[in-house]
Every structure is written in structure tokens, then in C-alpha cells.
């Protein structure tokens, strides 16, 4: 069954947990799609895990369109959500609609995601009015890392917690069909999930959310620069890849690879005519 913004909301009504992972290329998207994951986020996290930047701020619209287009070719039943990169929507309502439209039209995404609470509700409303579904994102919003002073848990004191509750209700009212809660205390995220009717997708927000999302390189043990506390590693592919690469080097140097079975034959008759 094809996952859509509508089926996400229906899953919450049925109390069925939603699953999401990031992807940035065709091959990974195809594997994730075949596994039955509900949603793929083409995240601006690609700036860190794919392009080697220290944060997400350097990612451009062209980067997002390029990677989103690749992902949508591999995702047949999985909902594809494209991140709106830094400064693609903060500048004006007009810019937010235009750039959201580019991610849908050129990137072929089904949904766009933007970070922020009450301060971006005018953008959410305008994008939704343009018939583009929006996934909101509150709590730790990586594009605001400089304002936060680093990657820190949000909503730990009374006022900050109340502000997150207000933000969740505001983005719902603005028309978002779902909201990501990032690095929010578990009990607060559970409370927010009960307070709003749209699905909450948690990342570092505990099991009380309506769904979960992880960066796939994190959960597969492929990104060694930094592993957040909230990540569970389901594999250690970095180690396995290193072993495979080392073995490849050894076999090439020792003349073991390629073997006869990896080559193509030519008849002796043809070969003799070459001399």
C-alpha cells in the first residue's frame, strides 16, 4: 500500500506506530522501500553524513532537489519527505511556497518538512494552501544550532516545555499533517502526542511518540564522526565495510582478484590471429 500524508494520520487513529528513516540515494531508498518502512526523509542531514559538513547549514536547494529526485526513483510505496534547507523558507512566505513547490515539482517529493514552531506557521499555512503537505519539526531544530548554542535537549524547564506544547498545537492548527519531535524529554513528548491529533515522529523523544525516525547511517553504524545518545545501532557496517575493503586490497596485491571466474573469454583462434 502506498504511504501518504493521509495514511500517516490514519495510522495514529488506529494506534499503529509509524517508521521512518533517512535516505539520500536511489539504492538505499529502494532497500528501505522493500523493507516496508512508512516514510523516507531526504534530510538536510545529508550535509553532514554525505557531504562532510559540520552541520546542515551549507545544504542548498540544488542539493536537496538532486538527492530527493534520486530517492523518489527508488521509493515506490514509501512516503518521501524532503527537507527545506536553511534560508529556503525563513526569508519570506513567498520564498517558502516557491521552494516547497520546487521540491515537489523538480524533486518529486510528496511532502516537505520545515523546522520551527509558531514563527513558521504563516509559511506552513501558505504551503498547505498551495496543496503541498507539510511535516513540521520542533524541539531541537538543527538549522538553529547556532541560536541554541549546540545540539542540546529542548523543553527541560517549565517555560520551555510549555513553549513546545504551544508550538505543537500551532503547527497542527496551521495545517501540518505530522510533526517531528527532536531531542525532547520522553514524558513531554508523550504529553504532546496526546495533546494533538496529528502524528508525532520522534527522534530522541522516547517511545511515546506515534512514530520514530533515525538517520540510516547512524542506525547501521556507518557514521563514526558522532553518534547521538538516542541512536540504537542495529548493525556495525563501518567495521564490516573496512574489513571488506582491506580484503580487496590484499587480494588485488596478491593477484587473487580478479580470478578466472571474474573475466571474459576469447577463443584461441581469434587470439592467434592477433599475433
Swiss-Prot record:
Q: Name the EC number(s).
A: 2.1.2.11
Under the heading InterPro entries, the entry gives: Pantoate_hydroxy_MeTrfase, Pyrv/PenolPyrv_kinase-like_dom, Pyrv_kinase-like_dom_sf
Q: What does this protein do?
A: Catalyzes the reversible reaction in which hydroxymethyl group from 5,10-methylenetetrahydrofolate is transferred onto alpha-ketoisovalerate to form ketopantoate.
Protein name, UniProt field: 3-methyl-2-oxobutanoate hydroxymethyltransferase
The entry marks the following residues as binding 3-methyl-2-oxobutanoate, namely 44-45, 83, 113
- Top-level taxonomy: Bacteria, Bacillati, Bacillota, Bacilli, Lactobacillales
Q: What is its main location?
A: cytoplasm
Any one of the GO CC terms: cytoplasm
Question: Which reaction is recorded as catalysed by this protein?
Answer: 3-methyl-2-oxobutanoate + (6R)-5,10-methylene-5,6,7,8-tetrahydrofolate + H2O = 2-dehydropantoate + (6S)-5,6,7,8-tetrahydrofolate
The family line of this record is:
Belongs to the PanB family.
Q: How is the cofactor bound?
A: Binds 1 Mg(2+) ion per subunit.
Gene field: panB
| Catalytic residues identified in the record | 182
Per its UniProt entry, what is the enzyme's top EC class, as one word? transferase
Q: In which compartments does the protein localize?
A: Cytoplasm
Amino acid at each position: 500500500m502506498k504511504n501518504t500524508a493521509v495514511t500517516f494520520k490514519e495510522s495514529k487513529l488506529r494506534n499503529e506506530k509509524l517508521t521512518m528513516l533517512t535516505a539520500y540515494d536511489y539504492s538505499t531508498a529502494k532497500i528501505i522501500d522493500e523493507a516496508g518502512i512508512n516514510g523516507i526523509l531526504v534530510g538536510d542531514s545529508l550535509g553532514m553524513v554525505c557531504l562532510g559538513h559540520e552541520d546542515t547549514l551549507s545544504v542548498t536547494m540544488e542539493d536537496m532537489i538532486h538527492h530527493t529526485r534520486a530517492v523518489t526513483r527508488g521509493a515506490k510505496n514509501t512516503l518521501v519527505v524532503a527537507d527545506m534547507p536553511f534560508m529556503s523558507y525563513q526569508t519570506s512566505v513567498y520564498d517558502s511556497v516557491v521552494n516547497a513547490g520546487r521540491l515537489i515539482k523538480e524533486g518529486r517529493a510528496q511532502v516537505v518538512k520545515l523546522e520551527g514552531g509558531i514563527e513558521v506557521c504563516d509559511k506552513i499555512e501558505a504551503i498547505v494552501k498551495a496543496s503541498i503537505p507539510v511535516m513540521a519539526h520542533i524541539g531541537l531544530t538543527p538549522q538553529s544550532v547556532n541560536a541554541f548554542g549546540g545540539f542540546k535537549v529542548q523543553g527541560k524547564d517549565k517555560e520551555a516545555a510549555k513553549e513546545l506544547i504551544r508550538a505543537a498545537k500551532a503547527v497542527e492548527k496551521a495545517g501540518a499533517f505530522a510533526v517531528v519531535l527532536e531531542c525532547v524529554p520522553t514524558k513531554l513528548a508523550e504529553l504532546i502526542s496526546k495533546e494533538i491529533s496529528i502524528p508525532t515522529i520522534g527522534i530522541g523523544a522516547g517511545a511515546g511518540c506515534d512514530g520514530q525516525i533515525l538517520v540510516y547511517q547512524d542506525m547501521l553504524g556507518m557514521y563514526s564522526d558522532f553518534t547521538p545518545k538516542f541512536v540504537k545501532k542495529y548493525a556495525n557496517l563501518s567495521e564490516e565495510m573496512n574489513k571488506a575493503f582491506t580484503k580487496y586490497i590484499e587480494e588485488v596485491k596478491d593477484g587473487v582478484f580478479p580470478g578466472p571466474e571474474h573475466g571474459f573469454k576469447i577463443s584461441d583462434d581469434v587470439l592467434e590471429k592477433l599475433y
